[in-house]
Amino acid sequence: KAIVWQDRRTADRCGELASELPLVRAKTGLVLDPYFSGSKMEWLLVHGNVPVSPNLALGTIDSWIIWNLTHGASFVTDASNASRTMLFDITTMHWSTELCSMFGVPMHALPTVVASSGRVGETAASAGIPAGIPISGIAGDQQAALFGQACFETGSSKNTYGTGSF
């Protein structure tokens, strides 16, 4: 099951948590908003008929793609994606027990956070994809766009206009 970034069904829940904004801001640098996936994960657990089990896996699109390419051998993400969940502490660079508890997200269900560069697994044989192809590098779309637009110098900036503007 998946809920995309534009989905606002958790707006009321984020409103209920308004008093927690200082904690969320301090841990994540984010505002409480349904754009981020923490409240969506909570929604799936509460309303989406997703049972908590030892095998539960909750992640972002990168972790889902890698998990599928490796047939479940690698369940990973990087900080650029984890930091957009409202569950990742950008100071400690780990999942936050406080934020996971606030949203009712079991920490065992979250992917391992790894470096953005480096090998994270290899493909398993599947329809049209041979086994053993290295999977290297993870980055969120806008973080990757920074490199794609050659912003390599301090002070460089970029702007992307599409379904969202960043």
Where do the model's predicted regions map?
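Short beta-strand-loop/turn "lid" adjacent to the catalytic site in phosphate-handling enzymes
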Residues: 1-5, 31-35, 42, 66-89, ...
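ATP-dependent carbohydrate kinase catalytic cores
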Residues: 80-166
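Short Gly/Pro-enriched turn/cap motifs at secondary-structure boundaries
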Residues: 32-33, 55-56, 76-77, 135-138, ...
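Active-site phosphate-binding/coordination module
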Residues: 1-41, 141
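Phosphate/pyrophosphate-binding loops at sites that engage ATP/ADP/AMP, CoA/4′-phosphopantetheine
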Residues: 47-53, 68, 97-107
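N-terminal glycine/serine-rich phosphate-binding loop of ATP-dependent small-molecule kinases
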Residues: 1-4, 26, 54, 128-134
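A short alpha-helix-loop-beta-strand transition element characteristic
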Residues: 22-32, 50-59, 107
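Residue-level signal for inorganic ion chemistry
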Residues: 7, 44, 99
